[in-house]
């Protein structure tokens, strides 16, 4: 599914988890990720495919897990919108995170809103 590009591995792990919970934690680096300008997540709002991936599993989430997921997706969306100069949408997403997220994400979101304000002041 082309829509899920960038989130397809997440989809695979969720489907495996429906079959078994026999996962082991390996405290060792097994691979590396190369960050470059042409990677999919730079050019795409990754909250969209991630939202699509989890929709089939939402019935398994409790209220707090659903809220935590929404916070994560809004933070991802906010960053994408900031980078693509959609300031109003980014501010809306970051405000949701500030109202509902954990302190680390609240602070990051506040910083992003400050950057948006400073960027808008600089443009005027």
Pin down the residues of each PLM region.
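Inter-repeat boundary and helix-capping residues of tandem alpha-helical solenoids
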Residues: 6, 67-68, 103
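A ubiquitous short alpha-helical element
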Residues: 38, 60-64, 79
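Membrane-interface aromatic/basic loop that binds lipid-linked glycans or pyrophosphate carriers
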Residues: 78-124
